């Protein structure tokens, strides 16, 4: 379930998904539709996909938590289960909102990839350094993580880099600033 078509997050996340599908001969994309980054549209899109391909769906790739919430609602309303057990539909998401991580902890979201919203103070620091005539790095990377319900997958390789997957706990959720 894609985000709003043309949004930078949609473009990057869709490209990452398409690249992964292309790299795996045993992966098939059954449908690709925009959920417009909303729960309501995510649910509507998932309902449509379930009518077309319900028993063939193994994984639903949502480009944000709101779409994942809608997809989960549709999957469960159609009588399917979400989660990591055999025969269930796995839901992947982005954002790591508090509610998204809570669904990850419960096993409804299998993997939630962070989109850290706390860039403001870091950008302010860079601007202040530039205004003071100091040199700054040409690129600034944002610390982001991936969270899973269990430790089945401990890292994910993207290009030539390995990224750790953290098993979510209630302590992690409670300790986050957002």
What are these regions (language model features)?
Residues 1, 32, 106-117:
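Short beta-strand elements at the ligand-binding edges of bilobed clamshell
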Residues 1-9, 30-36:
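Short beta-strand->loop
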Residues 2-8, 20-23, 115, 119-178:
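Hinge/cleft segment of the Venus flytrap/periplasmic-binding protein
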Residues 12-15, 41-43, 96-100, 116-132:
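Hydrophobic alpha-helical segments within soluble ligand-binding/sensing domains
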Residues 14-26:
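Ligand-binding cleft/hinge of the Venus flytrap
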Residues 17, 31, 35-102:
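Hydrophobic alpha-helical
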Residues 29-32, 91, 112, 146:
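Conserved beta-strand scaffold positions in the cores of enzyme catalytic domains, especially
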């Amino acid at each position: 379930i894609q985000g709003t078509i043309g949004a930078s997050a949609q473009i990057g996340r869709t490209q990452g998904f398409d690249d992964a599908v292309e790299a795996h001969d045993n992966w098939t994309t059954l449908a690709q539709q925009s959920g417009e980054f909303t729960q309501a549209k995510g649910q509507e899109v998932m309902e449509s996909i379930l009518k077309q391909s319900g028993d063939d769906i193994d994984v639903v790739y949502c480009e944000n938590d709101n779409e994942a919430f809608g997809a989960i609602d549709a999957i469960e309303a159609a009588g399917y289960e979400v989660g990591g057990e055999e025969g269930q539909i796995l839901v992947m998401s982005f954002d790591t909102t508090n509610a998204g991580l809570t669904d990850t902890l419960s096993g409804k979201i299998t993997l939630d990839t962070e989109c850290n919203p706390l860039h403001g103070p870091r950008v302010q620091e860079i601007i202040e350094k530039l205004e003071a005539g100091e040199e700054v790095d040409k690129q600034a990377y944002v610390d982001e993580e991936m969270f899973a319900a269990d430790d089945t997958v401990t890292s994910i390789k993207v290009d030539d880099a390995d990224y750790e997957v953290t098993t979510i706990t209630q302590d992690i959720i409670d300790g986050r600033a957002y």
